[in-house]
C-alpha cells in the first residue's frame, strides 16, 4: 500500500532532444503512501540531482478519488544550467555557458481546479554560443536577460497558474 525509496537511483534521458538531455537522481529516500481509497496518502521524497542539487518533494495525493486530488510541493536548489543546453540550443538558439537554477513550486488540484505557485531563481545566467536550430524563437535574448537580472546577477521569477483542468481550453503553457 506504499512505495518506499531507500538510496534509489534514477538515470533519466530525454531522447527526443539532440543532443540528449540527461539527469541522474541519486540518494533518493522517502515514501509515497500509504495509499487507500478515500484517504490522501503522504509523499515525502528527498534526494540529489546530478550529485549537487538537493531535491525535495512533499505533499499528499489521493489517486483513488473520483476526481484527481493532490497538493505537492517540490524544491530543487542549484542545478547547473549548462546541462539544459540541449533545450536552450533547440528553442532559443544558444547554449548556456553558466548559471544555477533553483525551483520552488506548489501544485494543488481539488475538485478539478488547479492552483499553482511557481518560483524560479536563476543565478549568474550567462548565454553561450549561438547554434543553428529551426525551432529557435527570434527574440532579443541579451536584452531580456539584462532587464530581468538584478545588480547581483540574479533573476527571480514568480508566477501563479490556475484554472479548471476539465476546461478543454485550459493549458499550463498558455
Model-predicted segments: where are they?
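Elongated, acidic membrane-bridging lipid-handling scaffolds
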Residues: 1-85, 163, 168, 174
